[in-house]
Swiss-Prot record:
Record function comment: Heterodimer CA-CB: Crotoxin is a potent presynaptic neurotoxin that possesses phospholipase A2 (PLA2) activity and exerts a lethal action by blocking neuromuscular transmission. It consists of a non-covalent association of a basic and weakly toxic PLA2 subunit (CB), with a small acidic, non-enzymatic and non-toxic subunit (CA also named crotapotin). The complex acts by binding to a specific 48-kDa protein (R48) receptor located on presynaptic membranes, forming a transient ternary complex CA-CB-R48, followed by dissociation of the CA-CB complex and release of the CA subunit.
GO molecular function: calcium ion binding; calcium-dependent phospholipase A2 activity; phospholipid binding; toxin activity
Keywords of the record: Calcium, Disulfide bond, Hydrolase, Lipid degradation, Lipid metabolism, Metal-binding, Neurotoxin, Presynaptic neurotoxin, Secreted, Toxin
Assembly and binders: Heterodimer of one acidic (CA also named crotapotin) and one basic (CB) subunits; non-covalently linked.
Protein's name in the database: Phospholipase A2 crotoxin basic chain
Organism: Crotalus durissus collilineatus
A GO CC annotation given for this chain: extracellular region
Top-level taxon in the UniProt lineage: Eukaryota
Cofactor binding comment, as recorded: Binds 1 Ca(2+) ion.
Family indicated by similarity: Belongs to the phospholipase A2 family. Group II subfamily. D49 sub-subfamily.
UniProt keyword annotation of Repeat present: no
InterPro entries: PLipase_A2 (IPR001211), PLipase_A2_Asp_AS (IPR033112), PLipase_A2_dom (IPR016090), PLipase_A2_dom_sf (IPR036444), PLipase_A2_His_AS (IPR033113)
Pfam families, per database record: Phospholip_A2_1
Length: 122
């Protein structure tokens, strides 16, 4: 669920997802095209690919079980979809933490019109 993903991002990065990641680069937020702009944008690209493999799941709105303990995100038991969505979100949040040192404020609200060219394959 998007609200749960926001909590994971905040846990890992100490930042709310909105606005820092809602419109970042070419892949953070809704949709995406072109080449990822940097490591942060690549985290979002990989997250989009992860969700893309879950076409039969309601990736943005399904609630799942997870815990935030001792500095780690742990996904809990649930339906197959819930567990997979949680893993996509967990991996992305951890990726965003690893990419904090290269975060560029110039990409924070990046116009879609500047995301040109073919998208990479997942």
């Amino acid at each position: 669920h998007l609200l749960q993903f926001n909590k994971m991002i905040k846990f890992e990065t100490r930042r709310n997802a909105i606005p820092p990641y809602a419109f970042y680069g070419c892949y953070c937020g809704w949709g995406g095209r072109g080449r990822p702009k940097d490591a942060t944008d690549r985290c979002c690209f990989v997250h989009d690919c992860c969700y893309g493999k879950l076409a039969k799941c309601n990736t943005k709105w399904d609630f799942y079980r997870y815990s935030l303990k001792s500095g780690y995100i742990t996904c809990g038991k649930g339906t197959w979809c819930e567990e997979q969505i949680c893993e996509c979100d967990r991996v992305a949040a951890e990726c965003l933490r690893r990419s904090l040192s290269t975060y560029r404020y110039g990409y924070m609200i990046y116009p879609d019109s500047r995301c040109r060219g073919p998208s990479e394959t997942c």
